[in-house]
Amino acid sequence: MELKMHNVQETENLKFDAEVGKVLNIVIHSLYTNKDIFLRELISNASDACDKLRYESQLNPNLLDLSDELKITISSNKDKNELYITDNGIGMNRQDLIDNLGTIASSGTQKFLDAIKNSKDSSQTVELIGKFGVGFYSSFMVASEVIVESRKAGEEESWIWQSKGDGEYSISKSDNQVPRGTKITLIMHPEENEFLDKFRVENIVTTYSDHINFPVEFIDEEGKSEKLNSKAAIWTKPKNDVTQEEHNDFFRSVAHVGGEPWMILHNKNEGAIEYTNLLYVPSIKPFDLFHPDRRCSVKLYVNKVFITEDNVQIIPQYLRFLKGIVDSPDLPLNISRETLQNNRVVEQIRKSLTKRAISELGKKAKENLEEYTKFWTNFGAVLKEGLCEAMPTDEREALLSICRFHSTGDEKLVSIDDYISRMKPEQEHIYYLTGNSLDSVKNSPQLEGFVSKGLEVLLFVDPVDDFWTSVIHEYKDQKIKSVTRADVDLEKFSSEEDKTDEENKSNEEKTEETILQYFTTVLGDSVKSVKISKKLTDSPVCLAVDEGAMDLRMERFLREQKQLNYRTPKVLEINTKHPLIKSIMKSYAESGENPTLEDMIHLLFYQACIVEGEEMDDVSLFAKRLNNLLGKISV
């Protein structure tokens, strides 16, 4: 239907409400960053109009014939450079046009919602999204002139609203035989003619309006109609009515990964804040999980109209493996619906979703460890990123409780609660060791004393472990301690046969003190100190750090990332029961200082550095000392 402007009655020229000219300029040039939004907004308004009519017809059945199909149609005329958006919803009369289009931020939809809220018939509900009163004016981003022709349901007269977005508009009565509803004609800027193309329109509709309640059709120049929105908003169904096949199809459309969802979170919250979430945990790890951008993949909808998936802080970064949607009429959007405001409502939804996700993952872990291990292999490292974030103790402990770790005490992954349940009565700490791989930590000299005394140690092999262990030092009143700490004391776990009588012990201490001084003198500034190890059983030496100092692996990581430009001296622990150390002690006691002993001591220090992945200051000197010793060996 073309609009014939000559077929109108007397035109009434009006000015927009106070300061609207300035506001229009903001809307057109600053408020929206994506021009596609204009069509989303017009379709949303059309959907609102259809919703209004459906509601009003329940009170007045004469407004809507049962055979009527409420829908939205889009068409274009490339010769005239015009785009048309038509709906057969409630329509507007003269006063509606003035109130709703002549006043910015005084949306008819909001007024309608207020009327519903104040209605005594509280059982009736309606889904309306145009709460901001400015979406219509985004049309002027792409159009030089906007013409609205409308007839309100139940009324005979039709009206034409017309404006060029310059602070004025006109209203006139139309003599055209206008069907119920509203038709918007956009006279496009020449450079915006891409929006006249059917495929461009279809892309916008499927992106933003694929799930609205009413069909959106495109009518081509030959009069052929094609429905553009096709997907049902399955999250609006009761969760028990959604089939696995529907879940699989929707999951693939939002997750862009293969396979089926490993876990489904489908919930409707009807408390102080209303929202529905349909979130999936993939069974396959996405390729971009650790991309520097680390984008979340949860789409935000308001009453089934897509708003954005960018800058959505509706889930924390450490749950970014979740794919799906959150839909809420209560989500606080800025006036352009493009950027979420950081306020209390968003934070409450975020907290609720986070708590629910952690709770459901915890249930999965208890139900089937084998299945949970698959999840943990894919996403455990991401989940542990959350342990580095600032959060209340109870939330952090809830997150830590669903983490799983390798351990010296079990071939299967264990929880930290499993570990605590197996602690020895006299044990005061949860012990752990970090490393680059499971094999490397299992073979670490740091574990020898713990294994020999039956003490379980948790094995951390993800890079993120270095970070969270630097900020979390306690879990459920149990201290968490690295086995690389120099103050680790395992003597209280010794058996009776391991204890030495006081006389022998006194003699050993004198000998040990002498050798410690010699090691310290030889190594000089290369070490912070030299101590007798209380944890080594098979290896001669190892590196350690004092309590409160940076962990070995964390310091190395920061140096690699150029965040630290120096190396702190470490503690060297020596095992006085090892044959090599005994040989040095004996030789020193018999003949005192000599170059061969010094080479041996330096090589033992180099060995400890190599095992921990520490760089040597002078590789050439290491090779020289090694060659000196090898040259004295008789073959």
Swiss-Prot record:
Role summary: Molecular chaperone. Has ATPase activity.
Region (B): 338-556
Organism from which the protein derives: Wolbachia pipientis wMel
Alphabetized Pfam families for the sequence: HATPase_c_3, HSP90
Keyword Cytoplasm attached: yes
Subcellular location(s) of the protein: Cytoplasm
Region C: start-end pairs: 557-635
Protein name: Chaperone protein HtpG
Chain positions covered by the region annotation A: 1-337
One GO term describing the cellular component: cytoplasm
UniProt family annotation: Belongs to the heat shock protein 90 family.
Classification via NCBIfam families: PRK05218.1
Keywords: ATP-binding, Chaperone, Cytoplasm, Nucleotide-binding, Stress response
